[in-house]
């Protein structure tokens, strides 16, 4: 940790965005070592004064769960778990060339307090009410700003797209109860959308179907990307030269007004010369050619027991009576779950570890950035795609972001949320429609 950010440096960092656990600051100063960088800083929950819900310190059970992975426990002691988990664990599954762990930098007293005040007016009100920068922290994670290219040629615009793809497959686990068999036919994303609509968290259910994006079919990838423009929510954001031009800043955006979509498309067209159809083709081609979603899907599929199976192994790990089994009356299901409870500890840990890695993969985002390739360039460090409609080649890079380890004790939350989502959809079907109607476009294809 050689780099130190001092109080006077706070003015050079501006608001870029935030999620539940971290806030992102973008550098606007003149230091060559900081240009093209963002700072990922921890937040605390205002009502509890506790760190936001991510895993920064391991419990004794987590130490045993993750202890066999070299370097991971040591990273907790050095306060660099997010960096280590991304580079040691997730890069094995997603590819080291698509994972940027960043570097830990020290921060002097008052830096975060000043930075927090400076960005206050830029943060969504609901985020401000819920959380704040952890002013007591003494370090942060410095990462490349993947909405930009390093050393971008003069006059060349960079377009970056952030996609939170969510779970891209339908589970087939034998541990899913008959009452919840709808999970094998309808995507978790779609079912959750209807619960969110019912709770008033969104004003319109999304048209996006993760199965389209992960299908490997160019036509269906086109459909998925097109759907983002009418209902981006927190799944889709576009940046031009590092500045957000479409989508929400705080990860909680609802629908975008049609006028905003039109303005975004006008801005895109002005700086890139691309019409919407060109842009969708460019993004689709890069997703298809890079193969990154194939790696993401394979990582998500490490969850082969579903939460309805994995929750029982969680109770094995914490050596507590299974609270789920207490409420089950189905004899056949109890027999299956008894088999899980008889597994040795190392097998239970392997299944839960894979489940948590999968949970990170289901919740992370993919950042794909583009810039026009200079004519005559043959030795670029980046891959490229050629867009026939504008007769232009584009450099592109793809990185996964938000690769934090999920806390072990969140297993109970995952189970309860899963049951809540499925129970609501089973009772109500598609909100606003006839629950007896078959789900539209969500069954196996």
UniProtKB/Swiss-Prot annotation:
The kind of enzyme this is, by top-level EC class, is transferase
Looking at the UniProt record for this protein, which Gene Ontology cellular component terms does it annotate, in alphabetical order? nucleus
Whether Nucleotide-binding counts among this entry's keywords is: yes
Q: Where is this motif: EXKPK motif?
A: 162-166
Summarize where substrate binds, as residue positions. Answer: 127, 166, 196, 234, 363, 406, 410, 414
Task: Cite the binding residues for ATP.
Answer: 19-22, 40, 144-146, 162-164, 237, 402
Superkingdom, natural source: Eukaryota
> Induction: what does the entry report?
By abscisic acid (ABA).
Q: How is the cofactor bound?
A: Binds 1 zinc ion per subunit.
Does the UniProt entry include the keyword Kinase?
Answer: yes
Q: Which is an annotated Pfam family here? A: Ins_P5_2-kin
List the cofactors. Zn(2+)
UniProt cross-references to InterPro entries, sorted A to Z: Ins_P5_2-kin, IP5_2-K_N_lobe
- Residues that bind Zn(2+): 312, 322, 325, 341
Cited function: Phosphorylates Ins(1,3,4,5,6)P5 at position 2 to form Ins(1,2,3,4,5,6)P6 (InsP6 or phytate). Phytate is a regulator of intracellular signaling, a highly abundant animal antinutrient, and a phosphate store in plant seeds. Also phosphorylates Ins(1,3,4,6)P4 and Ins(1,4,5,6)P4 to produce Ins(1,2,3,4,6)P5 and Ins(1,2,4,5,6)P5.
What protein family is recorded?
Belongs to the IPK1 type 2 family.
What is the recorded name of this protein? Inositol-pentakisphosphate 2-kinase IPK1
Species: Oryza sativa subsp. japonica (Rice)
The protein's gene is named IPK1
